[in-house]
């Protein structure tokens, strides 16, 4: 996908409204979601893939190291950089992106209950792609590290970098 979006002058409107996307969504619908209203499913897929395709359409500058503060779309940009240039990708998560999006979606009124699972799966796939490409993934505490491993990052490529603020040194300021 990275190469496709870089070498082709992709019209996102033409892509999302085109026959190929329509048939891919239709196939997915028949295989996994035949009980949903198709028009709602199609528009959900379009709205779900638009931000990903916008991200994939971005120009990424050459760098030796890419650093993302989350696995989401920032992580995808880091993956793109690593794909196009000989480089490293570091992800420093203060929270676990997938879990944060899952919590937001569960509480969200704007997403129909039927579609929450699909959105959560999408964010999980994006995170897994970033974890797969990252050279190192850091977290602030051990439980977050364990979630990163559970979501697919190899244990030896994770580490805890605790918040290094020494509060006692700042108490009198």
Residue spans of the language-model regions?
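Donor nucleotide-sugar binding/catalytic pocket of nucleotide-sugar-dependent glycosyltransferases
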Residues: 26-30, 35-53, 117-172
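Short N-terminal targeting/anchoring amphipathic segment
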Residues: 57-75, 84-90
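Short, solvent-exposed loop/turn segments at secondary-structure junctions
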Residues: 18, 71-74, 96-98, 166
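Short, well-ordered alpha-helical microsegments
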Residues: 74-77, 145
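Acceptor-binding helix/loop patch of EC 2.4 sugar-transfer enzymes
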Residues: 2-53, 60-61, 91-120
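Extended catalytic core of nucleotide-activated donor transferases of GT-like folds
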Residues: 84-85, 95-99, 125
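A generic structural signal for well-ordered alpha-helical segments
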Residues: 81-82, 130
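A short acidic, amphipathic alpha-helical/loop segment
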Residues: 77-81, 172
């Amino acid at each position: 996908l990275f190469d496709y979006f870089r070498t082709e002058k992709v019209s996102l409107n033409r892509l999302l409204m085109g026959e190929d996307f329509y048939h891919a969504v239709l196939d997915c619908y028949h295989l996994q979601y035949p009980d949903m209203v198709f028009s709602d499913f199609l528009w959900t897929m379009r709205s779900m893939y638009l931000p990903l395709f916008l991200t994939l359409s971005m120009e990424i500058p050459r760098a030796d190291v890419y650093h993302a503060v989350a696995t989401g779309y920032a992580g995808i940009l880091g993956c793109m950089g690593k794909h196009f240039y000989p480089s490293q990708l570091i992800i420093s998560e203060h929270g676990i992106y997938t879990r944060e999006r899952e919590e937001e979606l569960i509480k969200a009124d704007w997403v129909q209950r039927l579609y929450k699972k699909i959105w959560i799966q999408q964010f999980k796939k994006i995170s897994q792609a970033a974890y797969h490409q990252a050279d190192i993934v850091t977290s602030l505490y051990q439980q977050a590290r364990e979630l990163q491993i559970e979501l697919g990052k190899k244990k030896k490529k994770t580490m805890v970098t605790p918040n290094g603020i020494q509060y006692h040194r700042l108490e009198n300021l």
